[in-house]
Structures are given as structure tokens and as C-alpha cells.
Amino acid sequence: MPEYEGRVRLTERAFPLEVYGGGPPDRRELELKIWLAALQEPDAVFKPFSKDWPTTTLPAFEAAWCAFQQSKTIGREFDLRIRRAFFAEGRNIGQREVMLDLAREANLDMDHFARYFNNGEARTAILEEGRLGKELYNVRGTPTIMLSDGTKLRHSIAYPKIQDGKILSVGRLPCCGEGCYESTRELFEKALKHEPKKNIQK
């Protein structure tokens, strides 16, 4: 949104749920959630998952972090590329080889990417980001949107009705497709009007 350029700064942090949340990705749960995502983004493409299911998403977090070290724009584009590889192409984002393939396909600087990806620095960084999120800001799930002082922002979402682990129905969606941009604008406006919390010392 160009109207907020230079006024609002958005910083992404990793929060691997398999480490700081409820464990590794659950295939059955995610397959149910795809229907919610399909309703939210009618033009999105989803491919049925194959037997080659990722047992971890840490390589994907690491790869995205490595791309962000090249630039924020490259990082955000590559983060989206990873999501498309998983949801639209059915690729196993838990495999390091797949992440390297995606990096090559995206024409990233492979020397730069591989250095961080292979020396353990990326893993250390994302685990530290997740730890701070949980311990300092009490993050419990994703996505969590917050201001620099820890104030959490929320916008309306559609909640599913779940019975015996199955999604039976979904509430009315507050927005769909590009219509959700307005919700994002509302979040940015709240950020601009927000007065940071003051530290009270006794």
C-alpha cells in the first residue's frame, strides 16, 4: 500500500509452531483449513497433498530468513514463493533440498543464501525470534500482529464450527480477496494513531 510507505514499517518475525506451539504441522488439520483459505481467496490455487508430507517446517523458516538477508523485498517475495510451493504445487517444504531448488528458481544469490542456510545461523536466528515472541510478548499462535510496544492488533475473522475434529461450517467472512485490503488499512491506521505504553516505575 503506497500511501503508507515511510509511515508504517512492517517487520516479520519467525514463530515456528512446532517448537513454541502445538508441535509439527498436522496434515488432517491443515487439509481442513484449506477450505477456509479457499473461501477467503477464491482465485488461489490449491493442490492435494501427496504422501510426501513435511514432518517439519524449520527448513522453510530458515530459507525465508536467508532470503530476507538479501533484502526485505526479496524476502517477502520468497516467503510467498514457499507458500505457493506448498499449497499450490504440493512440494515438501520440510526438505532442505526443496528449499535450495526454490532459491535457485527464484534467482537468489545462491552463494549468499547457502552460506546462511548451511552454517546454522538461520536456524539460530529463527529459534531466537520465536523464543522472544513467546517469552517477551506472549505470542501463542500465528499470525500475531503487534506494535513495537507489544500491543496486539486484531481484525475480524470467520470462526469455524468444529465437531469431533471436523469443520462443519464457517461463519460469514468479513472480507474476501482484495476486499481484505480495507482490513489491512484499518490496522495501519490504528498503528499510526497508537500511543505507546509508558513504563511506570515505582
Name each model-derived stretch.
Residues 1-90, 95-96, 167-173:
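Structural alpha/beta surface segment adjacent to cysteine/selenocysteine redox centers
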Residues 1-4, 85-202:
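C-terminal cap of thioredoxin/glutaredoxin-like
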